[in-house]
Amino acid sequence: MSHILTTDTLSPEQVAAVLALAEAVRDADGVAALSEQTLLRVRHGARGRGRFHLAYVDAEQGRVLAGCAFAEVSPGEPDSAEVAVAPQWRRHGLGRRLLDELWAHADARGLRVWAHGDLAPARALAASAGLQRMRALWKMRLPLRGTDSAPAATLPEPALRPEVAQQVEIRTFRVGVDEQEWLRTNARAFADHPEQGALTLEDLQQREQEPWFDPEGFFVAVDRGSGRIAGFHWTKVHDDGAGLTDGEPVGEVYVVGVDPDWQGSGLGRVLTLRGLHHLRDRGLPWVLLYVDEENRPAVQLYRSLGFELWESDVMYGRVPEER
């Protein structure tokens, strides 16, 4: 027998159970079912910005958490959700029950569900629920250190055009100083990207508290005249290898953004290279990144630097009229 609890607040015991479930799913599938953003909501609370749906089953050891879903709620946008079911409790209809629960709580804005890794079971579940493929996020990778199967990438030097170098300087992010200006530029750079562009000061500060945060790998290009941030490249290091290695740390192009006023200046490419050189100098063997498959300029840039497609995450959805 199963029971689904819907809440926006998790107890310490529920937090521990969800994190353990997420780890079990990642170990079984080789890919995380819950994103970094969702895990931050688990640890710090949704605080009115989302809902948790927890699926419990009665087992010999008592009631246990067998699955969970989280729906991120943003004004004017469809709910953005993820679903995870414990490996030992699959094929019991829990995934479909969680999807139905998500849909029951979605309003007129609709529902979007992310399937990380584009695995066959997720495709089948989406089809059974009448969900359509709407978007894909590519995961690309680049070898920074040569291996038997992949030679090390050759990285050009991150040189600004002379006229751009006269106007901007590239330095590292200053915690406690740059937050508000970075949020301004991030919102402008990602005005058409709701997940990234809507980041708040609280979201940023939560990431600053994460073990992986390192301001020495967070590069900002600052307008010498106005002091405004013209662009940035935030890098990240995954100590667990992120599925690319057997536990050896790898790097990530976490996010690159350029203010619309500076687009076309070559600043994005230079900032990307600055971060890649930083990650290579740390001795990391690989670097990965995520990019929307429809973002052709970004895909072209990353391919020109030697990145190749590795995996993809797929967004499925439907609108309320399709119930």
UniProtKB/Swiss-Prot annotation:
Task: Output the GO biological process annotations, alphabetical, semicolon-separated.
Answer: mycothiol biosynthetic process
What InterPro entries does the record tag this protein with? Answer: Acyl_CoA_acyltransferase, Bact_Acetyltransf, GNAT_dom, Mycothiol_AcTrfase
Query: Which residues of the sequence carry a binding annotation for acetyl-CoA 2?
Result: 256-258, 263-269, 295-300
Q: Which GO molecular function, any one, fits this protein according to its record?
A: mycothiol synthase activity
State the top-level EC class. Answer: transferase
Query: Which parts of the sequence belong to the N-acetyltransferase domain?
Result: 5-145, 168-323
What family does the database annotate?
Answer: Belongs to the acetyltransferase family. MshD subfamily.
What PANTHER family does the record point to? ACETYLTRANSFERASE, AMINOALKYLPHOSPHONATE N-ACETYLTRANSFERASE-RELATED-RELATED
- Described purpose of this protein according to its UniProt entry: Catalyzes the transfer of acetyl from acetyl-CoA to desacetylmycothiol (Cys-GlcN-Ins) to form mycothiol.
- Protein name in UniProt: Mycothiol acetyltransferase
Organism expressing this protein natively: Thermobifida fusca (strain YX)
